[in-house]
Amino acid sequence: IQGIFARDFLDQNPNVLRLFCAFGGGGFSAGIAVFLKQLRPDIQLIGVEAEESACFVAAKAAGKPVELPSVGIFADGVAVKVMGDETFRLCNALLDDVITVSNDEICAAIKDIFDDTRVIAEPAGALSIAAVRKYVSQHNVEGEVLGAILCGSNTNFHTLRYVSERRELGDEKLDVLHIRRCA
């Protein structure tokens, strides 16, 4: 079913060069990667993890899935202590890169998403936008079509207060950021 997300995204954004996808245990990213790499192997697929729950980064370093001693709870939708063997195998083979983002970067992304679309994304869903912001800033990207899969709507007012307080610390507003809803 994850391949459907990739197909729909590509149908609506055929010129994308890099696609950023939130990463928890790896199932969503693996499903997208399997489909995407068959259809468009030229597109770079970049997994995105919360710094506090970076199980794939730890697994890549160890060469196999490892259990994290703890995970953060802010981006609870991607808070996974250990990924499965098969998802590790697929993601390790098919993802072109993985980026970690801080809670402050996630908060800034949630605000950008709200400012552009009037949608309140959950922290785990905003990981991909936070990664695009970070990637553009670190690599001085200009004129490239970057895509981000944004999913999830599980948030509450307590989380929103935290986002409001922390977003300025991760905020480096990008004038080039444009968020478009895909049907």
Each model region followed by its residue ranges:
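Active-site-adjacent helical/loop segments in soluble small-molecule enzymes
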Residues: Q2-I4, G84-G143
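Glycine-rich phosphate/pyrophosphate-binding loop at beta-loop-alpha junctions
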Residues: I1-A93, K134-E142, L146-R181
